[in-house]
Design a protein with these regions (language model features):
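M16 family metallopeptidases and their MPP-like homologs
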Residues: 1, 8-14, 70-80, 107-222, ...
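Non-catalytic, conformational "gating/processing" segments within enzyme and secreted inhibitor domains
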Residues: 1-29
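Extended, regular secondary-structure scaffolds
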Residues: 19-37, 161, 239-242, 251-288
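His/Glu-based metal-binding/catalytic segments typifying zinc-dependent metallopeptidases
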Residues: 39-103, 133, 188-211, 270-365, ...
Length: 422
């Protein structure tokens, strides 16, 4: 009645539709049945720290689990707010350049220093005050000072000497391609757009703020050459007291300690209750259990809308395909609307590979693109790929032969996404 009231909701419609008709239905079937209620849903800004905070948190491990190489080290910095579309995208690009891309400089420096067994980055931008995190996983508590020193020294060097321009432009192109393509995999596009709208809408901003990216990318491409990203590092990651260093350490016996605290708390609460209050809890628990175990009445189940056979389209989708041959190679082309993006797959049969060597085909797939070549380091190769494409991926698959039981055809596939103009 309070939290699930439509006055406390955000409603959006997505798709090609008669908007007036849908809004009329929404009002007639839902909104008109409620009176408007004032709702104070404003999320207030947290006051910045006067100086960085340092905290250690413990997590439980069993008696058999080792304490060595089981600590998580992180430095987390608040970055402006979520209502700046340029900052919102710029730090996604910085996360990619510093920590996510193959050969990313900050990750590389931390790994070279032997800190932790893996380095992670995170830019949490779905909240009013986003934060940027650098995390060393499976580290030791004794590495904390070296971790912080390496992070700050690397960031200072980048701020003073500049970030590799090719890496920056590759990161910008990577996110611009993702924005234009809007490929959310199996997730409905309308749902993902709606969630992205909430990144600003929940905090009083324009719902379309983070969907309108043309001006943002145009600015970032120009600003990348003018020291903009270096200034972001200096302002938000080096000279910013709104920072928390969090150490998460393992502790044996912690589960038993927490269980005992909970037992004592519940025991104290029980002693504060009268006999009638205790009985009310018992009765309420019994009623809840009965409700959960009782099947829903048939008439209620029939209220749930279901697809009818007549709702399913009878016509099969047309398979648009042309087949031709280029230099002795069969080429299959699909002429479809793809928002100006070309999708290319080059497929190689693996019939000629001896069966004993087939596992190495999988190994080849795993390392290609992540090792140095005769012309590029693996970091430079990643930049070249992201500057010129929307990504290149490799896969290995097998297809059963319907004409011969137990036979199959192995395929090694290289897939690329590129703007048609390229």
């Amino acid at each position: 009645r309070k939290f699930y009231h439509p006055s406390n909701s955000f409603i959006y419609l997505y798709g090609n539709m008669d908007m007036a008709e849908k809004l009329d239905w929404l009002d007639r079937e839902y909104l008109s049945h409620y009176d408007h209620q004032p709702v104070d849903s404003e999320i207030h800004y947290q006051k910045p720290f006067d100086a960085p905070k340092d905290r250690e948190i413990f997590y439980p491990i069993t008696e058999d689990e080792p304490e060595d190489h089981a600590t998580y080290l992180s430095v987390n910095t608040v970055v402006g707010d979520d209502l700046d579309p340029i900052l919102y995208m710029a730090f996604q690009i910085l996360e990619y350049v510093l920590l996510d891309a193959p050969g990313a400089i900050l990750k590389k420096e931390l790994i070279s220093a032997g800190i932790g067994q893996d380095i992670l980055g995170s830019y949490e931008n779905g909240i009013l005050q986003p934060y940027f995190s650098v995390i060393a996983k499976n580290a030791d508590g004794s590495q904390k000072e070296a971790f912080l020193k390496t992070v700050k020294a690397t960031l200072k060097k980048l701020a003073d000497d500049g970030i590799n321009q090719k890496s920056l432009l590759a990161g910008i192109n990577y996110y611009e391609f993702r924005s234009r393509e809007a490929d959310f995999g199996n997730a409905p596009k309308g749902l993902m757009y709606g969630l992205q709208c909430l990144d600003s809408w929940l905090y009083g901003g324009d719902p379309l703020m983070h969907l309108e990216y043309e001006e943002t990318f145009a600015f970032l491409k120009k600003a990348a050459k003018e020291g903009y990203f270096e200034e972001l590092i200096r302002k938000y990651l080096l000279d910013n007291p709104f920072e928390a260093v969090i150490t998460v350490s393992p502790k044996r016996g912690l589960t038993a300690i927490e269980d005992e605290k909970l037992r004592e708390k519940l025991e104290a609460y029980k002693k504060s209750l009268g006999a009638e209050e205790i009985q009310a809890i018992v009765d309420g628990t019994k009623e809840l259990k009965e409700y959960q175990d009782t099947p829903s009445p048939k008439e209620d189940l029939e209220k749930i809308p279901l697809l009818k056979r007549s709702d399913i389209r009878k016509e099969a989708e047309k398979f648009i395909l042309t087949e031709r041959e280029i230099d002795g190679t069969k080429v299959l082309a699909h002429e479809l609307f793809t928002s100006g993006i070309g999708y290319l797959r080059v497929m190689f049969r693996t019939d000629h590979v001896p069966s004993r060597d087939l596992p190495y085909v999988g190994l080849l797939k795993a390392v290609l693109g992540f090792v140095d070549t005769t012309k590029h380091t693996y970091s430079d190769l990643s930049d070249e790929i992201n500057l010129n494409t929307g990504g290149i991926t490799l896969s290995v698959s097998s297809y059963a032969d319907s004409r011969k039981q137990g036979a199959f055809t192995g395929i090694f596939t290289a897939s690329a996404r590129v703007l048609c103009e390229k």
